[in-house]
Amino acid sequence: MSITKDQILEAFAAMSVMEVVELIEAMEEKFGVSAAAAVVSGGAEAAVVEEQTEFNVVLTAHGDNKVAVIKAIRGATGLGLKEAKAMSEAAPVAVKEGVSKEEAEALKKELTEAGASVEIK
């Protein structure tokens, strides 16, 4: 006659905590296993993602109002008229690199209002 799972559970329920601990230790010895919880490592997926602190403002197209875009580029970079015009015509091009998020957002807004297409990377 074999013992059912329900009978085993009833036997566990009737045991004291010390008796359960002794039973677990005996099972570990008999079967050569450990009852310790397995530690799962997250690997690369669980690595802390570092928040980006420096951004590049990239002009992707100067749009229809090229003059306003050139003025915005000059104001933001301090370039001369010729250099700012060349930059606007060389799109896609980084207008400013390594700037803070706030500065990048402000420059994007300024260039977008002038009619340019801008990305922050």
Curated annotation (Swiss-Prot):
The keyword Ribosomal protein applies. GO terms for biological process: translation. SUPFAM superfamilies: ClpS-like, Ribosomal protein L7/12, oligomerisation (N-terminal) domain. The keyword Zinc-finger does not apply. Keywords: Ribonucleoprotein, Ribosomal protein. One of its GO terms (cellular component) is cytosolic large ribosomal subunit. One of its GO terms (molecular function) is mRNA binding. Pfam families: Ribosomal_L12, Ribosomal_L12_N. Homodimer. Part of the ribosomal stalk of the 50S ribosomal subunit. Forms a multimeric L10(L12)X complex, where L10 forms an elongated spine to which 2 to 4 L12 dimers bind in a sequential fashion. Binds GTP-bound translation factors. HAMAP family: Ribosomal_bL12. Belongs to the bacterial ribosomal protein bL12 family. Forms part of the ribosomal stalk which helps the ribosome interact with GTP-bound translation factors. Is thus essential for accurate translation. NCBIfam families: L12. This is Large ribosomal subunit protein bL12.
